[in-house]
Amino acid sequence: MTTIPKPVTRIACFRFKSSVTPEQKGDRARAFLGLYRQHQDLIVAMPVGGKPLNTPLNLTNVKRDSVWDLGFIVSFKSEEARQQFDKEDGHGKLKEETDPLLEQVFVYDFEEEENLGW
């Protein structure tokens, strides 16, 4: 019996250094989209995302990190596709160009699971 590969969803958020200009942030966003455009065979659809909204949470004793500059979600066709994307030369080059501009990165990859995995 053959198993159907599960899509892998990636959530990525970026906090740029304070010295990074809006133009540089826009350039990095275009670079990310360009890389995904080159590898549409590995993804379900192009990434979606944007700048954060200032949504009040009103949670007790919960710290909220509100200084992200950019975030997006993308779904890969499978774990194999995600691994292939991460190994692409263009991905490595993009990281080399972008990492010096970043203060912090959050990347969370997951396969959809019943009851959120628990």
Range-by-range predicted roles:
Residues 1-70, 77-84, 110-118:
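Short S/T/G/P-rich N-terminal loop/turn motif that feeds into the first structured element of a domain
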Residues 73, 82-104:
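Short, compact, well-ordered microdomains
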